[in-house]
Structure formats: structure tokens, C-alpha cells
Amino acid sequence: MRNPNQCSWYPARVLCAVVVFAAMTVSFSPSTRAESWGGIQPLKSRRIDVERLLGKPLNEPSGDESTLHFNVAGGSVTVSFVNAKFVVNKKLQPALEGTVLQIVLQHENSSDTPDSMNLLKNRDFDRQDERDITVFRNLKGGVTYTFITGKLRTTRYSASADQLVRARK
């Protein structure tokens, strides 16, 4: 004999599973969020978060300077912050002042290549070549890789295009 309660809940369960899957797909899609590095996220993390994760900076910014420099294993990191002038010029929400604008990693001896990072066939990245410099940009994800003579030298993390649109007033 069949349990009538078992069948009546089945369509609701399926619908719920589909809705949850769709919500997770949208929230974790690369076009809706920026790449982060070491727990630091553009337009979300603040200076206190950066210092908690990376330690004391090499410099103490003065005046309008809004960048911090750190030494890390394998190179150095420069973290830039959103300042009041940037908020006004880009017509951003005032609450974003003081959040991370960009993270720049300078790699000293990286062995990564475009091929080893699977960038050559990745359609999310735009490629630009100039002499011995190759740049791969993903504006939707907010990440840019710069290779010099085939080796990774710089990685830049910034807000994604969608994040910047949502950050406007």
C-alpha cells in the first residue's frame, strides 16, 4: 500500500531543490562577485581586515595616500583603498570609503605560465600581447594577470564590473 503523504510532498521538495540550486548558481557565479586574495575582498574588506590578515604594513600612509605595502612569501603586496575623492568621482555609495579598491601582487620568482594557469583557452579572459608582455584580463571577475617573458609577474584583484555597477548611488 502506498503512503499518500509521501507523494504529496514530492513536488514541493523538487521545487525547493530547484530554487536553492538556482540561487546558489547565481550567487556563486563569477560574473556577480569579484575574485579575492587571501581573504581580502575588493569593496568589502577594510584596512583593519587587511592588517589582521597580512600584519603590520611596511609603510604608514600619510595625507591622502591610501595604499599599504606588505612583504609576503614569494613577493610583495600593495593594497589600495577607496578614498573620498574616488567615491565622489565614481558616484559610489559613501559607505564604500575605506574599503579595499585593489590588491596588487608582485611575484618575484613565479613559475606560473599562461598555459599552467589554463588561461590560453579560458574565454573569460581577454588577452593582450605587446612585445614580451602578455596580459590576461577578466573584467567580470576583477582579476588581471601580467606575464613577462612567459612568467607571471603581477596579479591584480579589483572589483568586478557588476560590483561597481551595484556600488553606485
Q: Language model features by range: what are they?
A:
Residues 11-12, 19-20, 110-115:
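General structural signal for secondary-structure boundaries
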Residues 40-44:
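Short, contiguous acidic and Ser/Thr-rich linear segments
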Residues 28-34:
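Sec/Tat signal peptide C-region and signal peptidase I cleavage site
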Residues 2-18:
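Bacterial N-terminal signal peptides that target proteins for export
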Residues 15-27:
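Bacterial N-terminal signal peptides
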Residues 23, 32, 39:
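Generic anion/oxyanion-binding catalytic loop in active/binding sites
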Residues 35, 45-169:
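A cross-family detector of function-defining hotspots
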